[in-house]
């Protein structure tokens, strides 16, 4: 039978930092009131990285907000001072997380090893200050480059959950109710095409931090004969193999007409039939529905488990909440011990992230020119290239008219104006600035 995977899915938006703008400044010193350009460059925007961290078991910590931003860079300053780069944003995810582009479904990365990382959004390149644009024909450039915008992306994170705790027991013993009491979140679970039976998972947090969160799974389908393939027992038993703790949930009230001790032995038998290693896992015996027992009956149940099984039983009530906190901490104590045995733990604060090239402002490949005519008989020049050019150098056309006209004329502006019917003395507009056409 097909093996079932528990898939946790989280969708988030990430935005890298914008590059800082280059500065337009000039030296202002004693005896040099009108010195040359000294504008510094803008810094580069921060990047967004995802890194696989062995201390995490779930994606729950990334559900607290939907949007994540790296820091924008600072602008350049006078005296050729460059702006500070924006801080990178590093998001930690569990080992085994698959990163996808939400819109296309394309896999960006499979973070299947501790410390493995990927860049999901590049920061913008900082703009150059006016110092870079001094030339023999322009000793005092009054323009500089604009910083590029950082990348933004909608990504989907998928994690094949490895449940830390498996709740096993007969149907109707209250496993789902226990999960609803102890857990803070319900992961978004993938659909199973061959069954309407959906595994019930919960994320438990001890003190609200990702490092103290763990996954609890209700393993359904466990009935007598499960190890022989009855129901879906053997499929879900495969998942229990990966748990750190097995919690036997038993109905101590006897409301289903079964004996609690016999229930325990039946489930243990199924585990041993399926896998000897599985039967050796750390276990907790939990007696649910204890609120239906009298104090005398509670003492009798405890004594009987100690005498006949040799282990104590933790009595709880998923209805009243009695013993729930004690159960959470008992599970966490065992999980902590198992996590100490993990190998390959990496200090992600010491990782030196390799960065791809930042996003740069790029001008269109060609100079496009479109001529329109308004109601006054004036000609309007439209050009995406010129718009991009002015954005790149954060200047209004009136301050760069000579440069703009030079670019346009080299690409056939005069011929296009004549073809559109322009004559000597007509008014022509380019990005809000007018000039007189001369043949």
UniProtKB/Swiss-Prot annotation:
Residues 4-162 form the Obg domain. SUPFAM superfamilies: Obg GTP-binding protein C-terminal domain, Obg GTP-binding protein N-terminal domain, P-loop containing nucleoside triphosphate hydrolases. It holds the Pfam family MMR_HSR1. Mg(2+) binds at residues 176, 196. Keywords: Cytoplasm, GTP-binding, Hydrolase, Magnesium, Metal-binding, Nucleotide-binding. Monomer. An essential GTPase which binds GTP, GDP and possibly (p)ppGpp with moderate affinity, with high nucleotide exchange rates and a fairly low GTP hydrolysis rate. Plays a role in control of the cell cycle, stress response, ribosome biogenesis and in those bacteria that undergo differentiation, in morphogenesis control. This is GTPase Obg. It comes from Fervidobacterium nodosum (strain ATCC 35602 / DSM 5306 / Rt17-B1).
């Amino acid at each position: 039978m097909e093996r079932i995977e528990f898939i946790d899915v989280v969708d988030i938006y990430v935005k890298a930092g914008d590059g800082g703008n280059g500065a337009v400044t000039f030296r202002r010193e004693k005896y040099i009131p009108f010195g040359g350009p000294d504008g510094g460059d803008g810094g580069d925007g921060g990047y967004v990285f995802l890194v696989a961290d062995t201390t995490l078991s779930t994606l729950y910590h990334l559900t607290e907000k939907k949007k994540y931003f790296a820091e924008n860079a600072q602008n350049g300053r006078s005296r050729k001072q460059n702006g500070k780069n924006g801080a990178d944003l590093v998001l930690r995810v569990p080992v085994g997380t698959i990163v996808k582009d939400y819109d296309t479904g394309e896999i960006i990365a499979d973070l299947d090893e501790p410390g493995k990382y990927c860049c999901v959004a590049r920061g913008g390149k900082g703009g150059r200050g006016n110092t870079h644009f001094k030339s023999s024909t322009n000793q005092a450039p009054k323009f500089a480059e604009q910083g590029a915008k950082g990348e933004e992306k909608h990504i989907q994170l998928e994690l094949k959950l490895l449940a830390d705790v498996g709740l096993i027991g007969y149907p109707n013993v209250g496993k789902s109710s226990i999960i609803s009491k102890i857990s803070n979140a319900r992961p978004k679970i993938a659909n199973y095409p061959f069954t309407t039976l959906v595994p019930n998972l919960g994320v438990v947090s001890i003190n609200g931090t990702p490092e103290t969160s763990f996954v609890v799974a209700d393993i359904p389908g466990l009935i007598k004969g499960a190890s022989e393939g009855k129901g879906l027992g053997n499929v879900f038993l495969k998942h229990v193999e990966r748990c750190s703790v097995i919690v036997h949930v038993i109905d101590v009230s006897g409301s289903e007409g079964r004996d609690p001790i016999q229930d325990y032995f039946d489930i243990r038998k199924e585990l041993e039939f399926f896998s000897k290693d599985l039967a050796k896992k750390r276990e907790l015996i939990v007696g649910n529905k204890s609120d239906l027992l009298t104090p005398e009956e509670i003492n009798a149940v405890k004594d009987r488990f100690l005498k006949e099984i040799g282990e104590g039983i933790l009595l709880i009530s998923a209805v009243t909440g009695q013993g729930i906190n004690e159960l959470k901490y008992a599970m966490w104590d065992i999980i902590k011990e198992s996590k100490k045995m993990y190998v390959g733990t990496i200090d992600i604060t010491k990782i030196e992230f390799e960065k791809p090239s930042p996003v740069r402002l790029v001008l269109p490949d060609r100079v496009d020119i479109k001529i329109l005519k308004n109601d006054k008989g004036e000609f309007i020049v439209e050009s995406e290239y010129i718009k991009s050019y002015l954005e790149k150098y954060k200047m209004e056309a009136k301050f760069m008219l000579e440069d703009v006209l030079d670019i346009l004329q080299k690409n056939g502006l005069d011929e296009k104006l004549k073809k559109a019917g322009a004559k000597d003395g007509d008014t022509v507009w380019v990005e809000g600035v007018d000039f007189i056409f001369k043949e």
